[in-house]
């Protein structure tokens, strides 16, 4: 049973990191692995953040403390980066 629990923990972490990578690409922080280019789409980044928020809501009370912290830390980091990128974009328009 412990092996299944560890496997699920790894899969949960992988799911979070997949959304995190997609958000970082949309924020223009990471290169798109397909195009090898950096481009920014804040609407798309917001979508990935909302997916992670939904995951937090739907899994509340059903994850380990470790899994909870991974998700909360990822969300916090992405939200800060989103605010930074959005403010850069606003300053660039002024």
Give, region by region, the residue ranges found by the protein language model:
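Acidic, glycine-enriched active-site microenvironments
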Residues: 59
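N-terminal intrinsically disordered, cationic/polar leader segments
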Residues: 1-50, 54, 65-94
């Amino acid at each position: 049973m412990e092996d299944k629990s560890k496997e699920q923990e790894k899969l949960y972490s992988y799911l979070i990191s997949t959304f995190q990578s997609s958000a970082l690409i949309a924020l223009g922080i990471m290169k798109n692995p397909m195009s090898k280019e950096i481009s920014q789409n804040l609407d798309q980044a917001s979508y990935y953040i909302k997916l992670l928020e939904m995951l937090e809501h739907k899994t509340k009370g059903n994850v380990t403390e470790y899994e909870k912290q991974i998700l909360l830390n990822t969300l916090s980091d992405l939200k800060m980066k989103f605010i930074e990128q959005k403010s850069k974009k606003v300053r660039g328009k002024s």
